Every structure is written in structure tokens, then in C-alpha cells.
Amino acid sequence: MKVTWIGQAGFLFENENIKIIIDPYLSDSCYKVNPRLKRNYSVEESFLKINPDVIVLTHSHLDHADPETLDYYLKDKSGVTVLASENAWNKVRTYGSEHNYVLFNNGTEFTVKGITFKAVYACHSDNQAVGVVFSVNNKTYY
């Protein structure tokens, strides 16, 4: 499994069978809300061209469930499984029925392409936030 940091709290996990994106934030939408939150580095444009099989949204803060970034991955596309904490799930379902939206609260397990994802407790100011754990080829990722 190749692991790539895509910025902020975002990661891409990929192998020959699956592409998983966790908490993608590839815009500057936080800056639009608060100019003190300006991005300090540029985004790698190639990250916007990824066709993920799974997107995990751990909570609904803009830097984890960014609508501008999600547009690239979900708008006018189909077949993405989106595992989202409750508040993020309520927002992301607006992209329509072309995707598989899974309510991913603490304790939820869901399997995609032979990989079981488990939502675990996360200590955060957002009380619906979760962490995610999954294993591939005898390696566990959190």
C-alpha cells in the first residue's frame, strides 16, 4: 500500500486494487471563511485528478470535508463509497444517489473491495468526529 500525504490532514492510500482518500482539503475554502486561515503551501494539482474508490470524512470541519474539494471527486461522477461521520454524512449526501454514502459513526465497520474500515473514537471539538482503522497485507493503518 502506497501512502501519500495530500495536505492538511489528508492522505491517499493506494495499491493496484483500491484508492482511498481520507479528509481531502485541496482548496483554500477556510481562507474564504477566515483570512487568517490562508493555505501556506500550494496544492499538488495531480491530487485533484484522482478517481477514488473510497473517501473517508472523519468530521465536517472544512479542512476535512471541504465542499470545493469534494466537487472534484463526486460531482458528475459515480460509484464512490463515502464513509462519513454523521455531520459530514448529512452534507455529502447532497451529491446525489450516484455514490454509496455510509454513515460512519464510532464502532461502524464497512468493507469495500475486501478492506474493512472501522470508525473509532476521536477526541475532538467536534463530538461526532471519528478516527478510521483499516488493514491491508498484514499492515494496519490508523
Name each model feature, range by range.
Residues D66-D76, T94:
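Metal-dependent catalytic neighborhoods of phosphoester/phosphodiester hydrolases
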Residues I22-D23, N51-D63, L83-E86, Y142:
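Active-site neighborhood of phospho(di)ester-bond hydrolases with catalytic His/Asp-centered motifs
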Residues V92-V102:
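Helix-loop-beta element that forms the nucleotide-linked donor phosphate-binding surface
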Residues M1-T4, K19:
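Extreme N-terminal starter segment of soluble prokaryotic enzymes
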Residues G7-Q8, S85-K91, N105-T108:
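Short, polar loop motifs at secondary-structure junctions
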Residues G10-E16, T111-Y142:
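Catalytic core of the metallo-beta-lactamase
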